[in-house]
């Protein structure tokens, strides 16, 4: 893994790819082929499988991302533990541009004031799907696979 100007906590596992200007807190984990760009924070034990792209994204503790995901300009919270956590299925993409190609504000899947307490229902975003931002999604939301 090529790492430039990142902050790493203890027991962080970065298995391959590129990370720049990002923060990985204790126990964060990214699989091979990761592309983690500036402004990204993986909080404690947040993780992604192989070939995950992140930019200006905050994953609260325990959040799990599947493989082949592009998840930029997002905050994802929810869940209470390693066994009860928010999850994004494989092959998910978050689109965050206007029809004119201009960047919009970030999407919120959960929120910080409640998510930081680790006492909210997890959010599940099914694989082979996507979202067109900006969106605000509440705790406990379940989106089936293949949905946009």
Describe the residue ranges of each PLM region:
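C-terminal, active-site-flanking charged/polar segments
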Residues: 142-148
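Flexible, glycine/small-residue-enriched loop-and-beta-strand segment within the central core
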Residues: 1-135, 147
């Amino acid at each position: 893994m090529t790492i430039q100007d990142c902050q790493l906590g203890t027991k962080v596992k970065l298995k391959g790819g590129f990370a720049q200007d990002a923060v990985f807190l204790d126990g964060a984990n990214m699989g091979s082929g990761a592309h983690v760009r500036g402004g990204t924070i993986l909080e404690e034990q947040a993780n992604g499988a192989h070939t995950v792209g992140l930019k200006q994204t905050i994953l609260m503790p325990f959040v799990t991302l599947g493989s082949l995901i592009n998840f930029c300009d997002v905050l994802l919270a929810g869940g209470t533990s390693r066994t009860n956590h928010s999850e994004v299925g494989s092959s998910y993409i978050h689109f965050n541009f206007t029809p004119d190609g201009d960047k919009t504000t970030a999407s919120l899947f959960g929120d910080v004031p409640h998510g930081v307490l680790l006492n909210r229902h997890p959010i599940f975003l099914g694989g082979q799907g996507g979202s067109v931002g900006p969106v605000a999604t509440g705790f406990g939301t379940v989106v089936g696979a293949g949905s946009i």
